[in-house]
Structures are given as structure tokens and as C-alpha cells.
Amino acid sequence: MKTLFVLLGMFVIYPCLYAQDAELQACREELVRGMSQKNRDSIAAAYCHLGEYYAYRQADSTRYYCEQGLKYAATDKAEPYLYLLNNLADAYFSSGQLDESLKRFRFVLEEAGRLHWDEVEIASVLSSVGVIYRRKEMPDSALVCYNRALALLDNREAYDERTQLLTSIAILYTNTARLKEGEYYIRKALEVSEKSDDMDMVMYAAATAGSIFTLRENYAEAAQLLYPVLAK
């Protein structure tokens, strides 16, 4: 029976590993093509994609590929230049280097203004800055960033970004013992998440809501919360 469970586990894991290997191979081939064509835009984009591949796997690799990509990226247009800058700042955050990450996210915002980047992307950067301030125990500064981001997303169908942002605000209020405000914002996040196609964001909001409802001693709703999420 133990052997059967091991084999079943392998059948589940192998397709995932194969998909990851295929994605990585595609990124490498993209870089080779860009190099062979000596196309700086293509090379920068390929390095950007490699950095994104490693974003949740290995922060050091993401930093390396972003730094390489910035050597080729044109600085007079938003993409992939701003994505490389943003991913590099995020890699520093993932490594726990909050001050360096904050400095680099601020530079992203400066360059985003210069290049007139999409407001949804700018809102995402502001949200990241807010998270850093929250981690640095600077709740007022975090809230300023979150509110600026919310204003940019107003009347936009950016459901994934709004879900993440509202959840971050709920966490901020909860961490400062303002549970009533935390519950208000997490309910708004849950409402928006119903229109989101990003299951990670949906689960993020649901898990946070469960914790907040538990702190509010709303155990019944906390227990029932995951059922509709798992049914999606």
C-alpha cells in the first residue's frame, strides 16, 4: 500500500515538473534566439521571462536575470524595462532586504511616471511598497500607499489586483488590532474575488478572511468560508 501511495504521488508530481521544465526550456530558447538575432529588445524580454520563471523559486536567480536584462532593455519605453525593475525590487523583498527593495520600488515609481506606465501596474507597485511599510511596522505610510493604489484602481476591472490590495489593507488593520476595519476590508476583498480568475488571489483572500473571522469569534462563517472557494 505504501508503494502505491508513492507511485500515485509520482504521477501527480511528474506532470508538474515536466510543465516547469518545458517552461524553462522555452525561456532559454527565447534567449538563444534573441542572442542569435542580436535583438536587444528580444534579449531583454527573454531575460525578463527567465526572471519571472524563478520569481517564486529562487530570488538570487531572479536578481541575476533581471540585472542582465536591464543591460539590454531600452529605457525610453515601459516594457520590458519597468517589469525588469519591478521584478528586481521584488526579488530583494523575497530575500528579506526590505530597505533595498523599498529603494528600488521607489525608483520604479519614478520611472513609471516618466514613461506613463499603465495605472494598474503602478497600483501594483504601490501595493508592494505598502507591504514593505507594513513589514517595517510603519502602518500609516502603508495605508497611504494602499489608498493611492485604490484610487488608481477605481472603476477599473482589475479584480486580481483589487483582491490583493483589499486583503493587504485588511491585514494591516488586523495587525494593528483594528479588527472591525479589518473585517470590513476583507469582506470587500471576498466580494471582489468572486470576479477574479486568479485562484491564488482567491485563496489568499479566503484564508485571510478565515483568520480574521476567527479573531472576531465568528467561527461558523470562518469554517464555511473555504467551501465555495474549493467549488470554483
Predicted regions and their residues:
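A "functional boundary" signal
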Residues: 16-232
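Sec-dependent N-terminal signal peptides
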Residues: 4-13
